[in-house]
């Protein structure tokens, strides 16, 4: 499979997603749609309730809200070694939604952890996994748990493979 085997598929909600053109393409579109819906629920909740949070969180909430508007969400191409990543602080988020071990789709909860990680990069003015990034990621995970769009996974005691990466510690 090459990048030529990627295709735009329209979701039931009339949004297009760039996914692998295989037997799982409609499942992937549904998964990506649900990820996008949930990150917008989190983004909007944080922004509209900003004054409830410590002022130290206001810059990251504003940056997330301002940068994450017309985000393009897609699946990683089959011939890449990349996992999930963000381009231009929210212009595009590309998700690896399949296990590198067996090719099965990851479940929505694990993908929400990955999505929260990626939008934490969007909200953080610094690059890499700095202390500020980790603070933002922790805050976003805590809020996503409260909103019931993510259920905490105890990676410390139950490591999980996600796109070939072993996640073995929890931010929350």
Placement of each model-derived feature along the sequence:
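Active-site-proximal or metal-binding-adjacent scaffold patches in catalytic folds
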Residues: 1-112, 122-172
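Walker B catalytic acidic pair
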Residues: 118
């Amino acid at each position: 499979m090459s990048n030529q085997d990627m295709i735009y598929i329209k979701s039931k909600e009339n949004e297009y997603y760039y996914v692998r053109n295989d037997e799982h393409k409609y499942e992937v579109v549904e998964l990506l749609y649900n990820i996008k819906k949930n990150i917008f629920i989190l983004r909007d909740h944080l922004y509209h309730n900003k004054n409830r949070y410590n002022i130290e969180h206001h810059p990251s909430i504003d940056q997330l809200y301002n940068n994450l508007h017309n985000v393009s969400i897609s699946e990683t191409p089959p011939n890449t070694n990349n996992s999930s990543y963000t381009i231009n602080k929210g212009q595009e988020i590309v998700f690896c939604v399949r296990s590198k071990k067996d090719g099965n789709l990851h479940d929505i909860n694990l993908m929400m952890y990955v999505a929260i990680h990626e939008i934490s990069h969007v909200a953080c003015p610094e690059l890499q996994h700095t202390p500020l990034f980790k603070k933002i990621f922790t805050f976003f995970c805590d809020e996503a748990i409260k909103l019931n769009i993510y259920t905490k996974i105890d990676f410390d005691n139950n490591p999980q493979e996600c796109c070939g990466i072993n996640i073995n510690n929890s931010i929350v």
